[in-house]
Every structure is written in C-alpha cells, then in structure tokens.
Amino acid sequence: MASGRLRPLREPTRCHRRVRQAPHGRAIDHPIAIEPTGGYEKPLLGALRAAGLPVETVHTSRFAAYRNLVGAKAKSDTSDARLLAAYAAAPDEVRGRKADHVVIAPDALREQLAELAARRNQLKHMIHAETCRLATVRNQDIRQEIAAHLEALRTAERNTHQAMMRLVRTRADLVNAKRLLQTITGVGDKTALILLALVPELGQISNKAAAALVGVAPFVRRSGTMNAPARIQGGRAPVRDAVYMAAVTASRHNRLLAPFYQRLIAAGKPPKVALVAVMRRLVVFANAVLKSAQPWKGAQLA
C-alpha cells in the first residue's frame, strides 16, 4: 500500500501465515509497529487487531529521532521495516517514552468520534477560508457562489456536531465523562467532545502528562548563560485550539480562573502567556474530574 494505491494479495500464502503466527510457534514479545501514513494504515491496523495480534502506531517524531540515534542513513521499504521492528523492540527510554506511559486499548466508537472531530475541524477551517474570501470578492456571481458554499459548510458543521452528540449518547461512560467535563466553567459541548474524541488518555495519566499531550506544558530553555523564557511546543493542535477558546471564557467567567488570570496580568505577564496558564489549569481540571469521577470542585463556587 503506497501513494494511495492498494495491491491486493490472495489468501492464503506462506507470507500471510507468517503474519498470523510467530516464527516456530513462539509468542510475539513486542507489538507490530506501523508508521502513520495519513490514515492509509487504518485497514492494516484493523486486520491485525482482528487477527488478535499486538500492533501499535509509532510516534512519528520519536521514530525519526530513533533513526538519527542509530545512524540509519538508508531509506527503503526493507530498511524501514527493519528499523520499525527494532524500534518496537527497543526499551522505553530509547524510544523516548516514559516508564509510566499509558497504552490506550482500541475503541471503535472513540475512533468514530475522532474522525467526526477531525471532520468538524476541517469544516471550521473551510468556513474561515471562505469567509475571508467573501470579504474581498466584489464580483456578485462569485459572492453568491461563496455564500451558498458557506451555508452548505455551516450546515455540514452543525450536522457533524449533532452526529458526535448522538454517538456519545450511545454509551453511558461517555455521557458521564462529558457531564463531568462540563461541570468546569468554560468547558462547553464542543470542548468536551474534542477532549473525549482526541485525548482518550485523560483520567488515566498524570497532570503533567496531560498538559504535555495537549501542548500547554512550558518547557524550559536554559543552557550555560542562556536563560530564555519557557515555551510550549508539540501536543495535539486541534485540542489546544478548543481549549484556547474555553480558556478565553474561563478567564472572564470562571470563579477560580478569572482571578488567577488577573493576578498573572498584574504581575506583568503578557496576556497570551496568562491565557496559556489558564489553558493548562483547564486541562489539569479535566484530567482530575475524569480520574476521580467526581464533578469539578470549583463548580461549588460558580
């Protein structure tokens, strides 16, 4: 499978049998590693899971760092396969993975929710792009075409949101998790759905890990005489965008976070830095309510 083309192979073949069972009857002692290919890997992931084989999608940047670590210069399908196998068998510290990392079990419903969340995000960006075009175009025919397209996009966005809501309502654990998240002042329907869809680790990891996953954990930059300001980096951008909007609301209306935001501003922090601090608090609160299965304690003050 490459460049959007799928080469079908007939079953059964000796090669396929070797995928289904370990060599010489031995158990597979580490997962089969697959490099992400923008979604083209999903059929293979599903087939391997259906066969009961351990499989994982590798972290792209960590795999690239591992390639540099071992000094691999060649780039071919065969060399990549060997390198992926070695990476899957490597210890956590070599893979850049924390010893207390959490492996999320496959969840078909959450995967559907994640696809809907990705689609809603795409529609949001298309709406923004078309709105910008409408502001600059003067030709009436083009304006009418863009306006009609915008209406269709907004309808599609609403339908996608409703589909996400319906999907969540089919499972009691997701209904309860969404309810708990929305006890946090500032977290509405859209933010709660994004957190459920794109951060399934919430409630099972530490607060520091949750902040790093979303990309709101500041990383220090100090070396020798250099003492640069800490900066956030990495993380899941669609989640961070959603939490940003929640933080804007929380910085004004949350009984705990609004004073916190004002204290940071009074201390001379730039507004964006103060807002990122609010974002981090929101992620910590979200992780805490899902871990404890209790409503947000600050809700008693709201």
What is each residue range found by the language model?
Residues 189, 194-267, 271, 298:
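Phosphate-backbone recognition surface of nucleic-acid-processing proteins
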Residues 1, 84, 193-194:
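Gly/Thr-rich phosphate-binding beta-strand-loop-beta motif of the actin/hexokinase/Hsp70
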Residues 28-40:
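Short glycine-rich phosphate-binding loop at a beta-alpha junction
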Residues 266-302:
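Basic, amphipathic alpha-helical segments enriched in Lys/Arg and hydrophobic/aromatic residues
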Residues 1-14:
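Short glycine-rich, Thr/Ser-proximal phosphate-binding strand/loop in the N-terminal lobe
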Residues 46-50, 56-183:
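Long, charge-rich intrinsically disordered scaffolds of nucleic-acid metabolism proteins
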Residues 13-31:
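Short, basic/hydrophobic alpha-helical segments
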